[in-house]
Swiss-Prot record:
Pathway: Pyrimidine metabolism; UMP biosynthesis via de novo pathway; UMP from orotate: step 1/2. Homodimer. This is Orotate phosphoribosyltransferase. Its EC number is 2.4.2.10. Belongs to the purine/pyrimidine phosphoribosyltransferase family. PyrE subfamily. Keywords: Glycosyltransferase, Magnesium, Pyrimidine biosynthesis, Transferase. GO terms for molecular function: magnesium ion binding; orotate phosphoribosyltransferase activity. The gene is pyrE.
Length: 213
């Protein structure tokens, strides 16, 4: 594990993107933490987020030729991360999709560079995996190849079965998923920072009940 993962979690805490307490997930589970990437909503925080994505993508070793951001959250992530990758000497095109097809102007659902080669999907999290599945269909329909998925946080918890949403994507499509940080990294943060000590046991219990290896 490299320090940037811990730096990302601390940054998320400072931005109130990551919170500890008692929360109810969409699946109806009582969770001791909550992560809302939508709160990276100003220029400075989006810039820093994109730097973390770029570093995570480079360290993952995934081979890719361009980025694709599924609407809507993935749009700004693809654009901002492409800028940060360019600063690191990796200049790649990016594209995104519209929710509704246009019948005038550019037309269609795709905007940006043509989907070609190995395409890395970038999103905030993988919950049900719907966004990833739709992205894969779009990419393959254009004759390109999905290369993997970059996300901000892997919650590492079971879905309806024994696998997590991330593991299901990896198994079903054979694609690598590169998170900036995971539940394991969050657990390390709690262990190493006494000010968060009260949340260590609740997170441990949650991981024991819902977590995956």
């Amino acid at each position: 594990m490299t320090d940037f993962r811990q730096d990302f979690l601390k940054f998320s805490l400072a931005q109130n993107v990551l919170k500890f307490g008692e929360f109810t997930t969409k699946a109806g589970r009582r969770s001791p933490y909550f992560f809302n990437a939508g709160l990276f909503n100003d220029g400075a925080s989006t810039l820093q987020l994109a730097k973390f994505y770029a570093q995570s993508i480079i360290e993952s070793g995934i081979r890719f030729d361009m980025l694709f951001g599924p609407a809507y959250k993935g749009i700004i992530l693809a654009a901002a991360t492409a800028m940060m990758l360019a600063e690191k000497g990796v200049n790649v095109p990016f594209a995104y999709n519209r929710k509704e097809a246009k019948d005038h102007g550019e037309g269609g659902v795709l905007v940006g560079a043509p989907l070609k080669g190995r395409v890395l999907i970038i999103d905030d999290v993988i919950s049900a995996g719907t966004s990833v599945r739709e992205s894969i269909k779009l990419i393959e329909a254009e004759g390109a190849t999905p290369a993997g998925v970059a996300i901000a946080l892997d919650r590492m918890e079971k879905g309806t079965g024994e696998l997590s949403a991330v593991q299901e994507v990896e198994k079903q499509y054979g694609l690598p998923v590169a998170p900036i940080a995971s539940l394991n990294d969050l657990f390390i943060l709690l262990q190493n920072n006494p000010e968060f000590g009260q949340f260590l046991e609740p997170v441990r219990a949650y991981r024991r009940q819902y977590g995956v290896e």
